[in-house]
Swiss-Prot record:
It comes from the Eukaryota. Belongs to the SEC16 family. Signal peptide: none annotated. The keyword Iron-sulfur does not apply. The lineage of its organism: Eukaryota, Viridiplantae, Streptophyta, Embryophyta, Tracheophyta. Residues 1150-1168, 1317-1343 have a biased composition (Low complexity). InterPro entries: Sec16_CCD (IPR024340), Sec16_Sec23-bd (IPR024298). This is Protein transport protein SEC16A homolog. The keyword Repeat does not apply.
Length: 1350
């Protein structure tokens, strides 16, 4: 040869063959002058270049000689021209001489084929075994002629297939060549990259067979016109989106290039040659197709000829046989060798459906198009030449890009071939079934995608990934599995086992039943309360052949699954991600034995849980650094539990205590152990502490100088000399003698000049010197952060002043600069940093949770558990400790527990939260209570069976008998407790003695603490308010008094209630005087004997000397000291119940407890129920709630929420005499007009002109400087209405309008039969101020206790 190229081949068999070829194993003697071929290991692309550069030189033999022209390296296609002759002769057959032509083509044009043919028509064929020397200029042979049988000589080298496994093909070609008339021109069209995978076999010399490979070439008959594929186009097909410029040799990217279009065009050119085939003149072309993309991850690179020769053996393509292992086959799907006997036994009992509509004969498929009556002739490997007619067929649901045609290679049909007597346990799916994914896939080249869909394996669900069987397969993307098993309950069987009753190979077509946006149907999944997972499956759609339903069953099915079982690693479900597993693991498997606060948790159980979590931190699936920090954090929380919530002793505690008994010693040991463990593992180097020290000789000189200075008594100079010479020991001694300031300064100088920045010793020295700002200077804290464990340990073990600020700063630096949230929280816990509600400035919300980086997901179960452990450790030292910002996270944790099905634990958490928030009084706390109560009620209802709960059934029964209950009290804000609390504050501000009222309000339990459960309409309990002054008397018929103060008549006569709320009337009133009422009357006997009996004559009279009311026959008590004057800062409030100002009455007098209405409540609303507790009562009236009936008027209750009511100043409507049994409290209202205020002001001035005294009721002390004033007389009978009469004391300030002084009202009681218009008279002068005698002859009210205001 003129020149030799370096062939880079990977196949060991090819290399051995050519080594023998060079060693004259197959050559004559003249071959010794030929240059040896060198073979190096290289890539496939280098192999292709070497083969492309091979050409014949045409300057040796003239017109009839063979010329090898060496193509340029820049050409993308080798220029091949031949004028030599090769031949093959066997005794068994007479073969006419045939000219072998090598078509010469380059990247720019295709040469005329006829011209090349004319040059080689006269070539003669040599005999077998002879050589046709194609020599160069020196006459040395360049090309060797080898018998075709030599390629198959060494069968043991190539697994029984010989070199390249081409011998069988050409032997059969030679056997059938005698029947071919005319000349057969062998055209080699080398398009694009000849070598595309590791299994390609390339021959050199006259055997320019272009590397025939089953997935890269096809045997086709070329028409007489001679159609050839442009090689540059093949290169462009190989790299979609790029275009090759032959003139410049550069690649250019093409926008919008579609690989599918290139594949389609190339396919049309290659398949169009099959339509018109001439029987007498046929060209055998080895068309090398270009591969667009190779699918990665092949099972194994095997010899391709072995598989081609097994096409007609009746076995699937994923079964690879090897002659060296008879009776065994390699399963490319299972990736293992299996016995052929086991497959035959399984295939005899398995009947599978045929997935094709096209008959495959002898293992070969034919390419079928829509052209009728077209014939294709394919050379069979079994030495047969078959001619068969293409069959017409319809394409259903085809929307692909293959020009409405199927394609296959020489081995595999356009669809799955399946002999009737052979069954497959795992069906193969090829290009036919892929093409039925209309619109859902993209086939990037012309080869059949021999991908196999695995059946369901044990412990898996859903379609497994498609495993390609060979290297050179198309890159196809499909949206769903191709073949499924209908087995839902037979997952425990082996994949190799024949599933007779459940096997179904019917293909799944997602194009059927799709939605408008081309989405396939799927099952609906929803979460249910209590850890349930609900799955609804539609059996009517295209899912009926999948594993989600059984074939032939219509309708839908709903399945309720237990979420805990699904997540716990059931064999029927695929495992979710690690994050999901950690979430459910914390809730279900590693949940706290809580609630810790308010629960009954033993110390052993708690320590066991901590040990399990510490062991989990050391597991392999957790990051090492994070696991190390979590382990340290949990150990710190355990120390906190051991020392009752303390991680450090208070500053200045007893130093004589043993170091081992303190919590800071335990914390220091923890950090020391972590540092030691890090040094042993090699990730924490030993830190250096000291800087460079002066030499020893210099130290000796400095010491002598300091000694001389001290001997002369110059301490300051000696101290300065010792500091400059780094003689810190004597310097500290001298500084201690000079004073604390010198000592602190010397320690600071030593830390800054001798110790390395960031070292723990330097940190401690600066803290001792009282310089915390120097510990972490700005911009140089990285060295301290590197040793943050040691620094934190030394600060913790040695308490100094303001060291907590340094620890907090260290945590902030770790969080902001290093992003170590766990390390930062360790610092915050040691510094005893308070927990804060969620905000941008909060440092500590949950232990170990980054609420800055993950504001929506930081409330994880493990973070809540760690925070609860810290709260529990605090309660061990202080049982009254409440971590208030943590309570809402407990409610969130209870919801998490309810989601996974742990309802009982979630209910306990709700109850614990309600108990913790029992004493809190704020708006957010009330909201948390509502959330916890709502979840608890929902859990209780769920546990009782939902709507079939016994409580609800009984409630419905009572409602059907008695009717619906009255509507619930209406609240303007929807929160009775909040309204009650706010009302207490408002009423306390209105009182002159607000201190006593506030004291009593703090002692009063709210309405929610003492609930009275009643049957509600829905079976739930309604909370009634606390017991009032006295208990209701069910044995007596209540007096229904009618008043018009709270009701107005509409024009149509309908009564309109003006009150904002009503008192729920007793349900027993619905029965009248029924049997049930009489029974209750016997249970609760009448208390009429306890009522006061008024006599015919009043026992009290007004004493002019004492200026007060006294009782006849009773010696008056001694004069008491005058009370101190009232506070002057309390504003004056003058109120009256004017009906023209009803809006103010509603705003100021509406109590928030929901038990009585604004304005004057009607007796019909108050008499049957329980009167409410006065919100502004003090400790002297507390006995009314204890069941003791008050005999005298409560003069210590001030303000609108008094137990008793006083008559109004004036009334706009004539009231009706009231006959109620109890005194109903009411709130004060402002005066209606200025005339009444002026009248009261005038009376107050008259009262203050004389001596002022107070006559109180017997047994109750009365103030001596208080004055009385008479109410404005009313022309009608008195009615109980609220009134606050303000009487100025001495020393009081000015009032609202400037001329009415501030005063204090006092009320007393009088025993009388009735009160008429002449009961009280306005005073005429200050000296004659006294009430007129009460009229005892009137009997309008009978023997009722009336409230009289003096």
């Amino acid at each position: 040869m003129a020149s030799t190229a370096d062939f880079l081949l990977d196949d060991q068999t090819d290399e051995d063959f050519f080594d023998k070829l060079v060693d004259d194993s197959y050559t004559p003697t003249a071959s010794s002058s030929a240059k040896e071929l060198k073979f190096d290991d290289g890539s496939d692309s280098d192999d292709a270049k070497a083969f492309a550069n091979l050409s014949v030189v045409d300057d040796v033999l003239g017109d009839g000689d063979v010329a090898l022209n060496e193509a340029g390296l820049g050409n993308d296609v080798a220029n091949e021209g031949t004028s030599g002759s090769v031949g093959k002769e066997e005794p068994s057959s007479s073969i006419a001489p045939e000219a072998v032509q090598f078509v010469n083509s380059d990247a720019n044009r295709l040469r005329d084929v006829d011209v090349v043919r004319s040059e080689v028509d006269d070539m003669a064929l040599t005999e077998t075994g002879k050589e046709s020397n194609i020599v160069d200029g020196s006459g040395s042979p360049g090309v060797k002629e080898v018998d075709w049988g030599s390629f198959y000589a060494d069968s043991s080298v190539n697994d029984g297939g010989g070199f390249g496994s081409y011998s069988d093909f050409f032997t059969e070609l030679d056997a059938t060549a005698g029947n071919v008339q005319g000349q057969a021109e062998v055209a080699v069209a080398t398009g694009g990259n000849l070598v595309a995978n590791d299994t390609i076999n390339t021959s050199v010399g006259l055997d320019n067979s272009a590397g025939f490979e089953q997935h890269q070439g096809q045997v086709q008959h070329d028409s007489g016109s001679g159609q050839y594929v442009d090689n540059s186009q093949s290169w462009e097909n190989l790299y979609p989106g790029w275009k090759y410029d032959a003139s410049t040799g550069q690649w250019y990217q093409v926008d919008g290039q579609d690989a599918t279009v290139n594949s389609q065009e190339s396919y049309i050119n290659s398949t169009g040659n099959w339509e018109s085939v001439a029987a007498d003149n046929s060209d055998v072309a080895y068309l090398k197709q270009s591969t667009t993309s190779a699918m990665a991850g092949t099972a194994e690179s095997v010899s391709t000829w072995n598989q081609v020769s097994q096409v007609g053996n009746g076995y699937p393509e994923h079964m690879v046989f090897d002659a060296q292992y008879p009776g065994w086959y390699y399963d490319t799907i299972a990736q293992e060798w299996r016995s052929l006997d086991s497959y035959n036994q399984a295939s005899q009992t398995t009947v599978t459906g045929q997935a094709h509509d096209q008959q495959v004969q002898n293992g070969h498929a034919r390419t079928t198009t829509y052209h009728n009556n077209s014939q294709s002739s394919v050379y069979d490997v079994n030495n047969k030449n078959q001619t068969f007619k293409a069959q017409d067929f319809a394409i259903q649901g085809q929307h692909g890009s293959w020009d409405e045609s199927y394609y296959a290679n020489n081995q595999q049909a356009g669809n799955t071939w399946q002999p009737v007597n052979v069954g497959k346990a795992e069906p193969a799916v090829t290009s036919d079934s892929l093409s039925r994914f209309g619109g859902n896939q993209q086939v990037n080249n012309l080869y059949s995608t021999e991908s196999v869909a695995e059946q369901f394996k044990p412990n898996t669900i859903g379609a497994q990934s498609f495993i390609p069987q060979h290297m050179n397969v198309a890159s196809a993307t499909q949206n769903g599995p191709l073949s499924f098993s209908n087995d839902l309950y037979n997952r425990q069987q082996s994949v190799d086992h024949a599933q007779k009753s459940f096997q179904n190979n019917q293909l799944f077509s997602p194009s059927v039943g799709r939605s408008s946006d081309r989405r396939p149907p799927h099952a609906l999944v929803s979460f249910g309360f209590g850890g349930k997972l609900i799955v609804m499956k539609d059996n009517n759609g295209s899912l009926q052949n999948t594993s989600f339903g059984s074939q032939g069953i219509g309708g839908s099915s709903i399945t309720v699954l237990n979420l805990a079982e699904v997540i716990s690693g059931s064999a029927s479900y695929s495992s979710p991600g690690e994050d999901s597993l950690s979430y459910f693991r914390c809730l279900h498997q590693q949940s706290l034995p809580g609630p810790l606060v308010g629960g009954n948790v033993g110390s052993k159980e708690l320590h066991k849980w901590i040990d399990e979590r510490l062991l989990h931190c050391e597991s392999s699936n957790m990051d090492f650094s994070r696991g190390k920090l979590l382990k340290m954090l949990l150990s710190l929380l355990r120390i906190s539990c051991q020392y009752y919530g303390k991680l450090r002793s208070p500053f200045g505690s007893d130093a004589s205590q043993k170091e081992t008994d303190t919590p800071e010693a335990a914390v220091a040991k923890l950090f020391a152990f972590a540092k030691k463990d890090g040094i042993q593992n090699g990730y924490a180097p030993i830190s250096q502490c000291l800087q460079h020290l002066p030499p020893e000789s210099q130290m000796q000189v400095t010491a002598s100088e300091v000694q001389n200075l001290l001997a002369s008594g110059r301490k300051m100079e000696a101290l300065q000399c010792a500091q400059e010479g780094h003689l810190w020991g004597p310097a500290l001694v001298i500084a201690a003698q000079l004073g604390d300031q010198f000592y602190v300064d010397t320690v600071k100088q030593m830390a800054l000049r001798q110790l390395i920045p960031g070292s723990p010793l330097r940190t401690l020295c600066l803290l001792v010197a009282g310089q915390p700002a120097e510990v972490c200077p700005t911009g140089s804290s990285s060295s301290m952060l590197d040793n943050w464990e040691e620094n934190l340990g030394i600060i913790t073990a040695n308490r100094t002043t303001d060291d907590d600020l340094v620890i907090i700063h260290l945590g902030d630096s770790m969080w902001k600069e290093r992003g170590e949230i766990i390390a930062a929280h360790i610092c915050y816990l040691i510094a005893d940093k308070n927990f804060d509600p969620y905000s941008e400035s909060a440092r500590l919300c949950l232990v170990g949770a980054d609420h800055w980086k993950c504001p929506r997901t930081y409330a994880s179960p493990d973070a809540i558990q760690r925070t609860e452990l810290y709260e529990y450790s605090k309660t061990l030292g202080n049982s009254q400790y409440i971590l208030l910002p943590f309570q809402p996270y407990k409610i969130i944790y209870a919801h998490m527990l309810a989601e996974v099905g742990k309802l009982s634990t979630a209910q306990k958490y709700c109850q614990a939260v309600i108990r913790c928030l029992k004493t809190s009084r704020s708006s957010e706390v009330e909201m948390w209570k509502q959330f916890a109560s709502s979840l608890e009620e929902r859990i209780r209802s769920h546990q009782e069976g939902g709507n079939l709960a016994p409580a609800k059934l009984v409630g419905k029964l009572l409602n059907s008998l008695w009717g619906m209950p009255p509507p619930a009290p209406h609240s303007t804000t929807g929160n009775p407790q909040v309204n009650e609390y706010q009302h207490q504050q408002q009423e306390a501000a209105k009182l002159s003695y607000s201190q006593s009222a506030n004291t009593m309000s703090s002692l009063m339990p709210p309405a929610s603490i003492e609930p009275v459960h009643e049957w509600g309409g829905n079976g739930r309990t309604m909370a009634a308010h606390s017991r009032s002054v006295s208990e209701p008397d069910f044995s007596r018929t209540p007096i229904q008094d009618q008043t018009d103060s709270s009701k107005d008549k509409a024009p149509d006569g309908v009564t309109q209630v003006k009150s904002t709320r009503k008192v729920p009337s007793s349900r027993f009133s619905r029965f009248g005087i029924g049997i049930l009422k009489n029974t209750v009357g016997k249970v609760f006997p009448s208390r009429s004997s306890n009522e006061a009996k008024l006599g015919n004559e009043n026992q009290f009279y007004y004493d002019d000397n004492l200026k007060r009311w006294v009782e006849r026959g009773v010696e008056p008590p001694a004069e008491e000291a005058a009370l101190p004057p009232p506070p002057t800062s309390v504003p004056f409030r003058s109120n009256s119940l004017g009906h023209e100002n009803k809006s103010e009455i509603k705003n100021e007098m509406s109590p928030s407890s929901g038990s009585w209405s604004s304005g004057s409540p009607t007796p019909s609303e108050n008499s049957p129920g329980i009167p409410p507790v006065s919100q502004g009562s003090n400790q002297f009236s507390a006995r009314g709630r204890m069941g003791v009936r008050a005999r005298y008027v409560d003069t210590y209750n001030q303000g609108s929420s008094s137990m008793y009511q006083s008559p109004p100043v004036q009334s706009s409507k004539p009231p009706i005499p009231a006959k109620a049994k109890f005194f109903v409290p009411a709130a004060p209202a402002s005066f209606a007009n200025d005339q009444v205020m002026e009248s009261v002001s005038a009376e107050t001035r008259q009262e203050n002109s004389g001596d002022e005294a107070v006559v109180g009721s017997a047994g109750a002390p009365g103030p001596s400087q208080a004055s009385f004033q008479s109410p404005t007389p009313s022309p009608i009978a008195m009615q109980r209405f609220p009134s606050v009469d303000n009487i100025r004391r001495s020393g009081s300030g000015t009032s609202l309008n400037g001329d009415l002084p501030q005063s204090v009202s006092r009320r007393t009681a009088s025993w009388s039969g009735s009160v008429n218009s002449s009961s009280f008279m306005s005073p005429t002068s200050a000296s004659t101020f006294r009430p007129s005698p009460l009229n005892s002859s009137s009997s309008s009210l009978g023997e009722e206790l009336q409230e009289v205001e003096l």
